């Protein structure tokens, strides 16, 4: 059975993740998970997110909408 403290930790981690998502943005012009290298740059280089051009994991453009120009 999951303890109350474990649930609390999970909630805090989820809140931190949501705050980070709001700050960086999944579709935030090259500043989401596919854009840690700077504006318009994903891990794979210019115009790339995790999964390639415009498609990250689950088919989402993690690199943002304004990258790869």
Swiss-Prot record:
Keywords: Amidation, Cleavage on pair of basic residues, Neuropeptide, Repeat, Secreted, Signal. One of its GO terms (cellular component) is extracellular region. The modification Tryptophan amide is found at residues 58, 67. Its main location: secreted. It is found in: Secreted. The modification Tyrosine amide is found at residues 29, 39, 46, 53. Induction: Upon D.coniospora infection. Expressed in hypoderm. One of its GO terms (biological process) is neuropeptide signaling pathway. Residues 1-22 form the signal peptide. Belongs to the YARP (YGGW-amide related peptide) family. May have antimicrobial activity. May play a role in response to fungal infection. This is Neuropeptide-like protein 30. It comes from Caenorhabditis elegans.
């Amino acid at each position: 059975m999951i303890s109350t403290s474990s649930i609390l930790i999970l909630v805090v981690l989820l809140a931190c993740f949501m705050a980070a998502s709001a700050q960086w943005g999944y579709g935030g012009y090259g500043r989401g998970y596919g854009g840690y290298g700077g504006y318009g740059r994903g891990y794979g280089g210019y115009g790339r997110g995790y999964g390639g051009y415009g498609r990250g994991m689950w088919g989402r453009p993690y690199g943002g909408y304004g990258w790869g120009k």
